[in-house]
Each structure stands twice: as C-alpha cells, then as structure tokens.
Amino acid sequence: MPLVTPIDISDPSVKELVKFFNETLGFCPNSVLTMQRRPNIAKAFIELNMAVMENHGKLTSEFKRLLAFVSSNTAGCRYCQAHTIRAAERYGSTSKRLENVWDFKNQDAFTDAEKAALEFAQEASMVPVNVAEDTEKQLHVYWSDDDIVEIMGVIALFGYLNRWNDVMATSLEGDAKTSGQDLLKGISWVPGKHA
C-alpha cells in the first residue's frame, strides 16, 4: 500500500501533467500525481526531467531510458525498472536491447561506448557510490564532457525517483506493470510493494 495516495487523475490540477507524460509513458505516473500534492515539487521535477531528457550530444532518448533502467535496476526500485524499460521501448529500443540490458556487459546489442556509459551508470547508482577509476577512464574514451553531464543527469534524476518511489511504495500503473512482466523476464521481475 502506498505511503501517500496520489491525487485523482480527474483532478483539474493535473491536466497538464497528464498531457506531458502521455508522450513518454502513455499515462501520467502515480509518482507525479503524488508529488502534485505539493505542486511546486511536481513542477520542479518536470522541469528537471525535461532538461535531463533533452538531447544535445550523442545520447538518444532511447539510450537515456536504458541508462535510467540500469540505474534503477542497481538501486532495486521495481517501480522505476518498469517505467524505464517501458519508456525505452516507446522510444524505439529493440527487443534484444530491452530484454538484455540488465546483462549489457555480455551483449553485442550494445556498442563499447554504450557499455562504458552503462557501466558508469551501474557503479554511480550503488550506495555507497563506487565508481572505479578505470570506469571513468573508459567513459572519457567514448564520451565528451558535455555527454558525461547528460549521462550523470539521467543517473541523478533516477536517484531521486528511485528513492521517492521505493519509500512511497508508489503503486504501479497497469501498463507499466505489463511492460515489466513482458520485458524483464530475464531478471525475474515482480512488482513487489508496488503491486
């Protein structure tokens, strides 16, 4: 059961939230409907989300969602695992990438540059943070400083979301739950407290 009940989707105050998130996920997340209890928190989150997910360099929308999945998988947030894998699919990821991102190191579906970024996301998402020097060096082989800022933006954004949703025990929406069950069989995904 969620710690705090989200605002009802029919509430007029969430009209713009629903519109914004319909593009990314196909629905407005319960996490944002909960944040909306304090509208400035929801507004600040959406502005940060938009800034982080905007593409300026080599990172694509699809790859940013896969980075977010690796970050969320490392943190153990099942709510965010389901959301990020769904968003990656909606942004054009292939079934091979979606079904194997949890094992990216051993997959030919990912380039060496992507593997370096995903390894960085994994290590940067551990608590305590444990990014190896070699990982940082590999990151710089493939990515510019500007790209690394975008990568770190995704990791930091999902650090917030992983903590928010795990502590709040945010209830998963039906479509996100289906995406988790369909696309995350390789990690025996279950919704846990987010059911």
State where each predicted segment sits.
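Hydrophobic alpha-helical segments
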Residues: M1-A195
